[in-house]
Each structure stands twice: as C-alpha cells, then as structure tokens.
C-alpha cells in the first residue's frame, strides 16, 4: 500500500509540473501577444492610433523628387510625417538617370518601408514637370501589387504639408475619395467644402472652375482596385493633370467619395529656393 | 499509514499550487517590466531611441510664430518633428496681443508637452522681427525653471527643417554647443565644418565673417544653467543676433562645444508666401 501511495505522490507531482509548464507556456504566449500589441499600438504621442493595425489598408505614398539644394531637407521633413503613419509604404521616384547615392543613403537610414524608383522626366517638352516619375510609380504598382490587395495610393509632393489626420481620410477610400487642400488654386482651401452622406455638395474653386474634379494632387486618394480596372489610365501632360487623371479612372464630382470637408488636412506649401553664393 | 500518505499528497498539492502561484506572480512582474520598458523604448521607426529616457536632459524648444496663411501648415510640420523627440517641451511664443484660438486649438489637439506664450513684437522700429517673442521665452524660463534643472534651450523657427539627429547633439550640450546649419548665410552649410576634441577647428562663413560665433539660430543650444549665470543676457536688435546673444552668455569660437560637424542636421528652409485671390 505504501508503495502505491508513494507512486500516487510521484504521479501527482508529475501532473502538477506538467500542468504548471503548460500554464506557463499559455501565459507566455498571451503576454507575448500583449507585448506585440503594445509595440504596435502604444505610442500615443507619436503615432496615429489604430486598434488593429494589421487589418488597415496599406497606403502607398507616391513622391516624385528631383535634385536641388533643399531636396534632403524636404525629404527629411516629409519622412518625419510618414514615420508616424502605420501600414505605409513610400514609393519615392527620383527624377534621375539612376538612383543617386544621396537619396539612396537617406532612404537607407530612414528605417521606413520604401521602394526607391528612378526615371528621367522630360522637362523640355511639356507642362507637367514630373510626368514620368508619377507614371513610373503607377507602373510599379500595376506590376508589383496584387490586384486583390487592400491598398490605396496617395500622391505626396515632397514640399507639401500633411496633417496626420489626412491618413485617416485616405484609409476610408473605397474607390476614390477627395478632401480640401489648403493654399491651392489661389484659395485658402480648394476642393469640397460642404459634404453630406459621403458626397460633396459644394466645391470651392477659383482656378479653372470647369475641371471635372477640381482638386489638387494632395486632395485625393485612389484604391489600387481602380488602377487594375483601368489598366492604361495614367497622368498626361495637361495643366489640369489631377482632374484628367481622375476622369480617366471614372471619377467625377458626383461619384468621388467625400467623407470629410471641414478642416484643411493637407497644404500645398512651397519652399523658397535658397540663395547660395558658393 | 494510508491516512498519512493521503495527507502527504494533499500537502504536496498545496505546496505545488503555492509555488506555481508565486512563480506566476514573479513572471508577471518581470513581464510587466518588459512591457513598460518596451512602451517607452521600442518604437524604433517612430522615435529617437534612448536607453533611459527619463534621465535625459529636457529640451526646451523655443518657437516664435506669427499670423500668416502658412502658419498652421508650418506648425503642423514642426509638431510632427518634435512629436518624435522624447523629453521635449515646446515653448511657443505667439506674436499677438493675446493667445489666438487658432494656435491654442492647434496646440491643444497636438498632445505635445507645451507652454503657449504671447507678446507683440515691435516690427516698426527694428532689424529683428521676433525680438520680444524670443526674449519672452527666455523670461519664462528664468521665472519657471529651477536653476539646477538639467535642461537645454534650442531656438526652432517654425519654417526650418530639423533632422531628428540634431536632438542628440542638443542633449550633449554641457554649457553651449554648435553645429553646422544647411542653407544659411549664403552657404550650403554655415558654421563649424571641422571639429576635433569637442572644438571647432574650421568654420565655414560667408556672410559677416567677423561675427564672434558665426552660426544661424538653428545651429546652437545653451544649457539653462548658463541663463541663470548671466541673468540679464537676452536678444538685442542686431543683424548678428545669434552671435551677440552667444557672446553675452560668454561664448566664443574657442569655448563653444562642437561635438559633431560632418553632416547637416538642421536647415534654414523658408516657405514661399502663397498667392491667394480671395
């Protein structure tokens, strides 16, 4: 009997150790989950907060850039904006015959998720300065992104200013959406300024009021689905480049989504060329 | 005997449960520590990384700002820079008769640590546009900061561009330190361009080369201790405002600390005034 009782103690001991180990493993896994969640979520003063970051649609921010004295300053400033944005991939298209080491080194040090593209713009024969670089990014998306991907494209000039709140508007985009842009088209805010049920009921337009969708490049976003539905749509050499591009994707003032048009969330700022003597 | 053996099993059970609970408590506490650490440290893509954030010297970023079309755009962009900087307090001094609701609302929404000051600049009788606003911030520090505080002041114009790395240079400041500034004084980089053992051995200067410390406002930081040693030092209405201020605090080209002078970490960028028709 004593032998069996001793065995019972041993078995009980082994069972306990087993249960304890399993319990510890479960706890560890759960706590790891918490750590992981917190890592991506809890930087309240530094990032946009989202409950479930990985389920957010990806934003492809497309930026054309060209060599000039203020280039790295502009890219530094813009990178500090997009560093706050989760689920963001930066498509930087250089106006150059090959990647410059200046921009390559800058991107490499940035820790951002990015793709460095390059193509030479044709400045002598056109109205729009950065046609090739913009179309290069569209080409890259059509070649490298799955048509079923839940992703949205947004064109971000390197000298513009973007409120972090604009990225929330971008992520609401189902097919194509718009919002007002500050200091554009001769106005304090150009674009939709009154909206109802997701549509614009009033637009603020001064320059070329006949445009189909009168909005600055910083004032719209398009879901990649639409790019695959209209596989040849691209930017053309027109002064109303944004409107013509949106029209070629099937958008007009009535069907473009306008969820928010109260405050300005993006500004068409421009930087002075510095006077350098050396 | 069987009774005692049963008791043994019970005692063993209780002991195991107790040990398990203690183990779980210890594990929980340790993991909490990890979580807490990670919260403040691991946002590698969004913040400067510092091992022990709370022991860092505080940075007082001092920004003069005035009403104009691009004001909120500039403040938005600058706020996105300083949002990445730990242990930072923003002293924003408005050039106004009272706090404007535009700036107050902006700061209130920003989640930053800030103090909103105001004073009217006297634009009609001087060279320097923002003399009163700058001195107002110095006055606030001398009145509200303990002389023993480990804090450093840095003047950040709202249209300039700041690499996040400049804040590492600022925090090295023992009494007063300097670094080169991009696109300033007619040069691609003005200020110390060769340094050795914490001192500048060569300066790059074009405009007014006779200045005692030839550096732009974005190119120096001063420990608050020094402000209390020289309690009357302030900005005066001089074109070489930075140099005269640094001189009044006891600095010259030889005793100002220069730890790093290889890359440009701050740029004197300027924004174009937009053409608005309305």
Locations of regions flagged by a protein language model:
Chain A
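Short, well-formed alpha-helical segments that are part of the catalytic scaffolds
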Residues: 68-86, 98-106
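Active-site-proximal specificity loops/subdomain of glycosyltransferases
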Residues: 95-151
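A conserved hydrophobic helix/loop-capping motif in glycosyltransferases and polysaccharide synthases
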Residues: 54, 59-70, 93-95
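Short loop->beta transition adjacent to catalytic acidic/histidine clusters or analogous donor-positioning motifs
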Residues: 57-59, 82-92, 113-115
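Phosphate/oxyanion-binding active-site loops and adjacent basic polyanion-contact surfaces
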Residues: 70-71, 126-134, 238, 242
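Short coil/turn segments at secondary-structure boundaries
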Residues: 30-31, 73-77, 103-106, 118-120, ...
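C-terminal catalytic/acceptor-binding lobe
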Residues: 1-41, 216-278
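Conserved catalytic core of nucleotide-sugar-dependent glycosyltransferases
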Residues: 143-147, 154-156, 160-239, 272-277
């Amino acid at each position: 009997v004593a032998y069996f009782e001793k065995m019972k103690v041993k078995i009980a001991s082994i069972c306990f150790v087993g249960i304890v180990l399993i319990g510890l493993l479960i706890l560890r896994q759960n706590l790891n989950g918490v750590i992981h969640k917190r890592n991506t979520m809890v930087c309240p003063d530094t990032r946009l907060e989202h409950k479930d970051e990985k389920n957010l649609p990806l934003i492809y921010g497309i930026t054309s850039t060209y060599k000039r004295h203020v280039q790295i300053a502009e890219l530094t400033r813009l990178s500090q904006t997009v560093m706050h944005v989760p689920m963001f991939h930066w498509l930087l298209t250089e106006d150059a015959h090959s990647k410059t080491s200046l921009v390559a080194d800058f991107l490499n040090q940035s820790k951002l998720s990015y793709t460095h593209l390059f193509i030479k713009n044709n400045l002598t024969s056109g109205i729009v300065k950065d046609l090739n670089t913009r179309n290069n990014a569209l080409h890259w998306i059509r070649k490298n992104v799955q048509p079923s991907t839940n992703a949205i494209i947004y064109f971000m000039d390197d000298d513009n200013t973007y409120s972090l709140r604009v990225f929330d508007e971008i992520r609401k985009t189902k097919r194509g959406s718009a919002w007002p842009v500050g200091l554009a088209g001769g106005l304090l805010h150009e674009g939709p300024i009154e909206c109802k049920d997701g549509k614009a009921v009033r637009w603020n337009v001064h320059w070329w009021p006949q445009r189909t969708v009168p909005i600055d490049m910083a004032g719209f976003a398009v879901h990649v689905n639409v790019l695959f539905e209209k596989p040849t749509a691209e930017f053309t050499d027109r002064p109303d480049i944004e409107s013509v591009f949106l029209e070629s994707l099937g958008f007009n003032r009535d069907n473009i989504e306008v969820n928010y048009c109260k405050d300005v969330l993006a500004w068409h700022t421009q930087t002075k060329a510095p006077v350098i003597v050396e």
